[in-house]
């Protein structure tokens, strides 16, 4: 599982700038789970072979008693609880403050691995200028400048060092390709637990309620109609009764990690609430992760015809990037519409792992070009020669030719539609990559 790093510090020390630096390798795909005045932001990052999740928080005042600062303090405590390691950010130019001491006291009591870093340190020399930060009792301080990109690699190295991470290639155990790893994702109270209770039965659900840390992968194997599945915990799977905040607060990270570990994600929406920002963020994360996806609208029986029509239009606009996914209207509590969902899950998994031969891909490509040529860009018109498969789950198609950097996104979508139709690809994203051949004449002219 990906390690989780929380950025903590008082307001305006540059946490968000550090967050953007640490997540830039994955285009800073941010899951901004709305609902509070200042909530936690989640993003993906990568350093060498190691990937991680970063949580950005609001300014932290541990003893805040009311208003926005109380909410921000609550969010920061939850971020720290979710994290494997904390990066405590202070301001190198402003120096140490009473708030810094309060935060340090809070972190020391937790005993969680913590890296102390002084941001805005550009142009400052190490030594006496940073000695005051030793008062915080958190060891050495690492000077960085997020705005200039200085010290970021050292910062992540220090953060990940206490976790003793194995090489991802060595850590990964071979998975049985016949088993579908399924994650049920969705915001709180959309009916995840009700749906899974219906699938597995109450006795099986108990096995999810195990003690463990954020990085524990909890899953339950089961079989349906001869197909083996492994259901990955997304932190909505708990016994009936009171759901304590200490449990609920892990839901976001576990959802992101479950999506990463799944073959297929069932994204559950609430018909009575419509498509929320949080739904759209989770859907975007699924797409960015390249996972096959099935949409299910729960509580369909609880809305009238007008609400249904409004919801369908909302899905068409707000989740347009998932138009390749099957959509099902269900009622988990009444067990209505569930059987077709299984068929779509199996179909999405098969589509994500479909093998496509080079001769067929090339034929489809040339037929598509003959029917509609790519748009000319100045003196250049892209020339496409052949295509082959570059990967599965999700399917990747690599197209070779000349001047392919001028191919528009609209034309790529046109090609994607042709490939999808031929290979019956439903429920999986597709990646199309363009590779232009070496042109010695162009190189010669530019020399």
Swiss-Prot record:
Keywords: GTP-binding, Nucleotide-binding, Repeat, Ribosome biogenesis. The lineage of its organism: Bacteria, Pseudomonadati, Pseudomonadota, Betaproteobacteria, Burkholderiales. PANTHER family: GTPASE DER. Associates with the 50S ribosomal subunit. The gene is der. Belongs to the TRAFAC class TrmE-Era-EngA-EngB-Septin-like GTPase superfamily. EngA (Der) GTPase family. Pfam families: KH_dom-like (PF14714), MMR_HSR1 (PF01926). InterPro entries: G_ENGA, GTP-bd, GTPase_Der, KH_dom-like, KH_dom-like_a/b, P-loop_NTPase, Small_GTP-bd. This is GTPase Der. Residues 3-167, 180-353 form the EngA-type G domain. GTP 1 binds at residues 9-16, 56-60, 119-122. SUPFAM superfamilies: P-loop containing nucleoside triphosphate hydrolases. GTPase that plays an essential role in the late steps of ribosome biogenesis. It comes from Polaromonas sp. (strain JS666 / ATCC BAA-500). GTP 2 binds at residues 186-193, 233-237, 298-301. GO terms for molecular function: GTP binding; ribosome binding. Residues 354-438 form the KH-like domain. GO terms for biological process: ribosome biogenesis.
């Amino acid at each position: 599982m990906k390690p989780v790093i929380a950025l903590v510090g008082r307001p305006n020390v540059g946490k968000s700038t550090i967050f953007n630096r640490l997540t830039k390798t994955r285009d800073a795909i941010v899951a901004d789970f709305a609902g509070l005045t200042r909530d936690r932001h989640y993003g993906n990052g990568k350093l060498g072979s190691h990937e991680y999740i970063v949580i950005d928080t609001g300014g932290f005042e541990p003893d805040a008693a009311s208003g926005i600062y109380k909410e921000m303090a609550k969010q920061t405590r939850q971020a720290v609880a979710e994290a494997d390691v904390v990066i405590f950010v202070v301001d190198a130019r402003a120096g140490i403050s009473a708030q810094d001491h309060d935060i340090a006291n809070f972190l020391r009591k937790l005993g969680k691995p913590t890296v102390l870093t002084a941001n805005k340190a550009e142009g400052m020399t190490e030594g006496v200028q940073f000695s005051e930060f030793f008062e915080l009792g958190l060891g050495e301080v690492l000077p960085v400048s997020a705005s200039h990109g200085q010290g970021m690699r050292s910062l992540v190295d220090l953060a990940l060092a206490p976790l003793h991470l194995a090489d991802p290639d060595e850590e990964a155990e071979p998975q049985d390709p016949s088993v579908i790893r399924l994650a049920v994702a969705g915001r709180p109270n959309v009916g995840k637990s009700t749906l899974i209770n219906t699938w597995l039965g109450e006795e099986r659900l108990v096995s999810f309620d195990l003690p463990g840390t954020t990085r524990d992968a909890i899953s339950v194997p089961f079989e349906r109609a001869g197909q083996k599945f492994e259901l990955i915990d997304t932190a909505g799977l708990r016994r009936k009764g009171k759901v304590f905040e200490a449990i609920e607060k892990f839901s976001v990270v576990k959802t992101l990690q479950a999506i990463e570990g799944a073959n297929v994600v069932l994204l559950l929406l609430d018909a009575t609430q419509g498509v929320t920002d949080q739904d759209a963020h989770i859907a975007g994360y699924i797409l960015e992760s390249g996972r096959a996806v099935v949409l299910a609208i729960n509580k369909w029986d609880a809305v009238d015809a007008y609400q249904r029509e409004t919801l369908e239009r909302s899905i068409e606009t707000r989740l347009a990037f998932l138009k390749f996914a099957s959509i099902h209207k269900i009622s988990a509590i009444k067990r209505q519409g569930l059987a077709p969902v299984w068929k779509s899950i199996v179909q999405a998994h098969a589509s994500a792992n479909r093998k496509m031969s080079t001769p067929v891909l090339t034929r489809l490509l040339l037929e598509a070009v003959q029917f509609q040529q790519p748009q000319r860009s100045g003196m250049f018109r892209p020339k496409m020669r052949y295509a082959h498969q570059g990967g599965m789950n999700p399917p990747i198609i690599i197209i070779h030719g000349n001047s392919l950097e001028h191919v528009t996104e609209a034309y790529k979508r046109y090609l994607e539609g042709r490939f999808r139709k031929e290979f019956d690809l439903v429920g999986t994203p597709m990646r199309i990559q363009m590779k232009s051949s070496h042109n010695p004449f162009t190189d010669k002219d530019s020399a």
